[in-house]
């Protein structure tokens, strides 16, 4: 390709001079931030070139200990196992079929050789289960998903939707991988709309069996993980049809889950009445064998109904402790939120890997610099900081938020507390959706931040991006999940006015309706001191104010439009508003958890580093939405400017401790195995990859 320099009529010297002058101009702006002196911004105001070397001395070990949590041991066991088994590491180039076999062998190795038994933790110690998932997902994301299908989806549905008889019969086989299985919910015509599923399970009282049928092509189970090659069983979601003595002859009891054997235990041949096709090569996650399932009058014993929320007796009588189809459906799906919790948590793991690679590379890579002086690290460019430092701060923010989600989920599994169930349901939907959308975008930013080298497959962004992309869709499409959060907020908003209680995560709404919705205070709207802007109270108030306003406004809009458009039409008319509300609420929860984590950090230097990151997270978000705050005069013009300047300053401060912040993730080398991310000897390792 013709280079730009070849087209330029200037001499090389002139051209270099111009570029250098432009760079110097940029750098000088960058090195001495043009902040107008303000008594309220003492630190910013005195920031000069020399202050750049003034850097927080962070106790990396203490920070790392605070971040890594209590399951370091099992994660290290997993990393050591795969490190010692090059034959189980996924090569850069691999065919779909080989990848599927390798992925199955990785799982078998993990379970039968390394002795890691994820299934034992699915119900009893979910925190440990998610730590395992994070570790195996960073070895190969296909492995993380394959493990999730086997233990969280197939195994989880058996133990969470079934009863003791199912646990007794299936637990060991699922645990040791003799009973490989699938989770067959989605159909060709219905993915997000699970209540629209058409597969039927009709009770035959004569034979005491259910008959599973795919009534039309649209009801073929589609995208089912483990179905194309390895699965022996499937949890099939189908409408339960019971014979009745009235004129209709049958009664549809709604969607229930059934265990359906799909392959012979000995020969692995597909069983009679079951047809299986391969969903083929995918954009990513090709280590997972997704398939399509069609059932033609497949008979299963009555006992195969997973009967925790609804049962059928020998004579065909239906019983349930829950009064309506909707309540039973809600309870069934409620038991499956573990998958979402796992995806949110794993997505933060992906974000850590990709931010680590991009930031290490940016510290190492040098381009341009002042004349006759060494080139500067690309992370010293304000633009690179702008791309990566708020991302690093966000990674920390999401880490603490998802750790909190996992804790709440574990508590919920133990207590079954009703309010906690509701809280975890909405929080897992919100965090899964928010974090996976963020990570998907961040992966592209990281690739671009590493220039051309970011595009080499060996440096991992391609596979991370392709494998992670679908996190936005499966276990609930993000746009659909955010609507659940919005619906929940509206429900609680309504309850609040009817004197109802609010669960923990939502409790700020109680105050917000009274405090935050009064007119913005004209005095505080003008406060622009650094102490004030870095005060968690200001930051949280700003987030809560935004959520409360969005909530109040959308509630009024829905009420107005529903008179003419009906409930469905009104919701659709306000859909974007509702999505913004849900995101705003989730950001508020994330900030609250980050502030709490900073407060609880025992080591002062680690705490100071976290505080920098937390302030950057908060102010960057406020700045990104500054129009909203300005529109209602929540911040005066000068305060908006001060927020912007402080955000840039914090970006720069976080850059100074970026190495310590990424090191604290303690990702092993073979996880961030991108050669460009190696700290020393980077380019020689990289050149070896291409054969020099
Ligand atoms: C690799 C992979 C693995 C999978 N594994 C499994 C598995 O093991 N088991 C299983 O059961 N399923 C599995 N799935 C299916 C997955 O769960 C579904 O794809 C997912 O639920 C989304 O459904 P859908 O594809 O029908 O999308 P749709 O629901 O058709 O969504 C398409 C688009 O429409 C939008 N949309 C839909 N409804 C609304 C609404 N109400 N408001 C606004 N926008 C809306 C969505 O935002 C989306 O952008 C897998 C899928 C893939 C790709």
Swiss-Prot record:
Organism: Arabidopsis thaliana
Description of what induces expression: Induced by dehydration and abscisic acid (ABA).
Catalytic activity, reaction form: a 2,3-saturated acyl-CoA + O2 = a (2E)-enoyl-CoA + H2O2
MF terms in GO: acyl-CoA oxidase activity; FAD binding; fatty acid binding
Positions annotated to bind FAD: 186, 192, 225, 365, 384, 452, 473, 477
EC number: 1.3.3.6
Function recorded in the entry: Catalyzes the desaturation of long-chain acyl-CoAs to 2-trans-enoyl-CoAs. Active on substrates longer than C14 and mostly with C18-CoA. Activity on long-chain mono-unsaturated substrates is double than with the corresponding saturated substrates.
Name the UniProt record assigns to this protein: Acyl-coenzyme A oxidase 2, peroxisomal
Superkingdom to which the source organism belongs: Eukaryota
Cofactor: FAD
One GO CC annotation: peroxisome
Subcellular location: Peroxisome
Subunit structure: Homodimer.
Tissue and organ expression note: Expressed mainly in flowers and young seedlings. Lower expression in roots, leaves and bracts.
Gene name per UniProt: ACX2
Enzyme class: oxidoreductase
Transit peptide: 1-49
A Gene Ontology biological process term: long-chain fatty acid metabolic process
